[in-house]
Amino acid sequence: MPDALRLSGLRAGYGETVILEDVALAVPERGSLAVLGRNGVGKTTLLATIMGHTTFHAGAISAMGREIQSLPVYERNRLGIGYVPQGREIFPSLTVEENLTVAQKRKRRNGSPGVRWTLERVYDLFPRLAERRHHRGNQISGGEQQMLAIGRALMGNPTLLLMDEPLEGLAPIIVEALLKSLERLLAEDQLAVILVEQHAKLALQVTREALVMSRGRVIHHGPSRELLADPERLGRLVVAQ
């Protein structure tokens, strides 16, 4: 089977400014990858490039065996790439339920079955959203907005889910709830996940593989459990410049 995502020799940035240099990685179907590193090393740019929001300079991006670097953003989304950006970007004037239903897709372009994610499944994963289903997006807490952003991406029925710092700025009790939901999602659902996160140890706990970036390049790629078991090495890698 083809990998859910494969990058080779990736060079990208914003206009003529190059941020990512010679990035290569592979995420198998149902795989999970933590992307770690200090602020400003290219983690968010990596996700934005996969989605098509940056200037592509060289290399290749393949999703489920198909090269996508020349495709517009909406085509990448239709092929099964879901994106939870920083800032959540929910619709503040729509209710929780409206935010979810507006994102629902009934089939994928890649030939896999129709609806797998429904309102009921999202509410089962995030019970707090069921309780707030009739509240507008601007009437719920930051943690609930993050749950909504993830739920909305899932309603697109993705094969690959990109999440950019979903735990940022959240209270510890909400972080714990989100982590439990992510662990369940990775255990039960047939999708691959790339998780960009500043909370390195938390990200390593819920993923199988880890990638560390510095100055737009990959400086480490290996099993998450190995980094989690070696805090000293993790610290050296994450602060590497």
Please tell me what each predicted stretch does.
Residues 59-68, 79, 113-119:
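Conserved ABC transporter NBD signature motif
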Residues 153-154:
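ABC ATPase C-loop
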Residues 161-165:
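Catalytic Walker B motif of ABC-type/P-loop ATPase nucleotide-binding domains
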Residues 176-190:
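Helical segment within the ABC ATPase nucleotide-binding domain
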Residues 36-38:
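The feature captures the beta-strand-to-loop junction immediately N-terminal to the Walker
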Residues 124, 206, 212-217, 221, ...:
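C-terminal boundary and immediately downstream tail of ABC-type ATPase nucleotide-binding domains
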Residues 51:
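Helix-to-loop junction immediately C-terminal to a conserved catalytic motif
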